[in-house]
Amino acid sequence: ESRGLGDVYKRQHLHGDHCFGLLGLISTFGLLGRTADLHIHSPEGLEELFAPMLAFFCKTLTYKVLFHEFETKEPALIYDDRSVTVTTIPLKHRIPCCGFLFEEKQRPNHIIRDMVDFYKVPVYELNRIKNGADFVTPEGEVIANSRLTRPSAPARKYAYCSDTMYLPKIAGQIKGVDLLFHESTFAQTEQARAKETYHTTAAQAAQLALDAEVKQLVIGHFSARYEDESVLLNEAAAIFPQTILAKENLCIDVDGGTAHEK
């Protein structure tokens, strides 16, 4: 079966703010004439919750909705295609919850056309050369792969962690990711409240980013008590300077480390 991430939706946990909008999205897709299957990955219980609502409100859907449930205690590979994998990150919240680690697969090297033409490399050899093979001429001369190709861009990694209390142990799984989104519900002055509600402070999110040696941190999921969210940004940036405050319609250049609004 061939599908892309655009046909796959992932629910971390079954609190209402993370799944109430799903029924409307499914219905809207139907109104827009969608025909491709929709795959929804979630902790156990979402299909049981949504099956009666889909049967009642979405009787005439033009596509299939397929549920895939995963365990939340250990990391699990839940998606794999030729370009990317998605693995769960076990988190700790009031109910079973996971984050997600998105990992691009390394693309083949880029062919240097002038060199390939110069050595008269046959077309049928190009895939092997893209994947690192040297080329041997009819005369037996070995042409190093480095003379025929240039490296493709490094594969990127993105980790999404919310909702959760501070979990230092996940630093190993998200080590060195290009971009980490981590919830920062409270300021450090509310650390006790954060622990009580199984959430994280901005300082704790920044410490995790520092320990995991990530390249960029985006903090979000802020408590409504903070009218000025810069207090959370300042708290995190004091520990991990490469911190960005999540905003609606924010676009982040993972490679360049910049952010702008649409």
What are these regions (language model features)?
Residues E1-Y9:
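Single conserved hydrophobic/aromatic residue that forms the stacking wall/gate
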Residues D37-G45, V218-G220:
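Short internal beta-strands
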Residues E71-I219, D228-I239, D255-K262:
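Metal-dependent phosphodiesterase/nuclease catalytic metal-binding core
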Residues F57-F70:
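A glycine-rich helix N-cap at a beta->alpha junction
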Residues Y9-H18, H93, H221:
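Histidine-centered divalent metal-coordination motifs
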Residues T35-H39, R156-Y158:
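Short active-site oxyanion
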Residues G21-T28, E227-E235:
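Metal-dependent catalytic neighborhoods of phosphoester/phosphodiester hydrolases
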Residues P241-N249:
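Conserved phosphate-binding/catalytic loops in two-lobed NTP-binding clefts
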